[in-house]
Amino acid sequence: MDKKKKIALITGICVVSLLLIYTLLGFFGLPYAIKNIAPKYLKDYNATLFVSDAKFNPFTFELNATNAELNTTSPLFSTKQIDLKLKPFSIFKKLVEIDIFRLDEPKVKIARDKKANFNFSNFISDDNATSEDNSTSSINFALNNAKIIKGSFSYSDQNLTKPFNVSFDDINYELSSLNTKKNRDRKSVV
């Protein structure tokens, strides 16, 4: 075998191997990380994450997760299904672009206990309360289509003299073309 054929063979094997690794990590690695590694990371915040099933297609950049639940001292967020489609090549234009973000039957429950602690307080750092950051990011964010289907929101405050509870059901909402990219006049486009 001559030298050019050997180099072509080795290059071909490397390309096929990288494509195979990318495919396996996309189809199996990312769903495994969502279901098993992310919950371990959230334990540091005294939170639990459960995802019944997660699927990712590394070629279309679509993520689907079913029966996701995030709990802290009490239930915080759950949804029947999350659909997310990314446009990863927009990052070369300094833009994080989400093409589709859909939540099917999301439930958000905000609760304040008798000690005036919210059920999401675990995610808020006390260090950030005193520092101000006036820097602007050079990376923009775009959300092309967001949809909430049959959502619900509830708020409960047990810290008041008379406990307060409110809830909203059957929330349907759709949002298109949200973008933080600045236009020619240096104003954000909303």
Feature-to-residue mapping (PLM):
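Short acidic/polar N-terminal linker immediately downstream of export determinants
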Residues: Y45-T48, A129-S135
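Flexible beta-edge/linker motif
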Residues: K55-N117, S131-N159, E174-R186
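A short linear hydrophobic-aromatic micro-motif
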Residues: L49-D53
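Short, flexible N-terminal segments of the mature chain
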Residues: D169-Y173
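Conserved small/polar residues in nucleotide/adenosyl-binding loops
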Residues: V189-V190
